[in-house]
Amino acid sequence: MKIKFLIFPFIFFLLIILVLFYLLIIDRNPSKLPSNLLNKNFPKIEAVSLLKEEKFLSSKEFGNEIILVNFFATWCKPCIDEHVFIKKFSNEKKIKVIGINYKDNPKKTVKWLKKLGNPYSNIAIDKNGRIAIDWGVYGIPETFLINSKGIIKYRHAGPITDEVYNKINKIIN
């Protein structure tokens, strides 16, 4: 009977150690989370446009060109950090940059863009997060690169850094 009382705590302790060890060894980098959309057509978008009077339709916005789709919000600190790179992509004119404003206040977004500069050719408002769900977004910022045939070729979860910027440029060229 005493042996049973000693074995159960030992097994419990061993399980806790195994769980902790597992949590330490798994890679927790969100940019390495898999996307089911890679090498597939982009999900269609119908939303209110932040910049234009007409409805945002991906069928109009996504033509026969390379497109960078960036999910962002004004309350997102990493979005502010990556904004420099988004502007760089826009200024280079190699690709069209589309923004998806995720669960944000449109008036704040307009002010934010006036202050930091607007790199987006158009911005869809994702008020309730439905577009992000359709795209499999884990969190923001998150960026997708779509080729001229409408196929998602690259996805990055997290802010764009020098390394990611260079990686996207290699794919484009």
Residues covered by each model-derived region:
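N-terminal targeting signals for export/organelle localization
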Residues: M1-V48
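Short, Lys/Arg-enriched, disordered terminal segments
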Residues: M1-I7, R28-S31, N91-E92, K96, ...
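A short beta-strand-turn-helix
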Residues: I45-I67
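Conserved segment of the thioredoxin-like fold in thiol-based oxidoreductases
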Residues: N91-E92, K96-N128, I140
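Short pre-active-site segment immediately N-terminal to redox-active cysteine/selenocysteine motifs
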Residues: N41, E65-I67, F71-W75, G139
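Thiol/disulfide oxidoreductase modules built on the thioredoxin-like
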Residues: K114-P119, D126-I172
